[in-house]
């Protein structure tokens, strides 16, 4: 059985798209890709990849906490970057949030992200 996770502490699905912030199933939490949208105004926060990564991780944390999990329970993330030139800046912030046992991770350069975002992160965590 699956449980849909929703929280107002993170952005609602982008432009009303048909997806959930997260799904809890089989002892795991599957979090939809998050960009640096602020939940209260729905606009991208930050001009640098560091600022945007900070907001993305804030959004991920809020969703994971709503599911009874947290960043310390991450097992896999996928990072989408507008440019791999931003890899060091993203890593600088990411490292501060994932502790000394970071999750498995893939990082991919993409042609475009929603609303001109520089970074998007999706995640799987233990429930």
Region annotations inferred by a language model:
Residues 1-58, 62-75, 81-127:
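N-terminal presequence-like segments and the immediate start of the first folded domain
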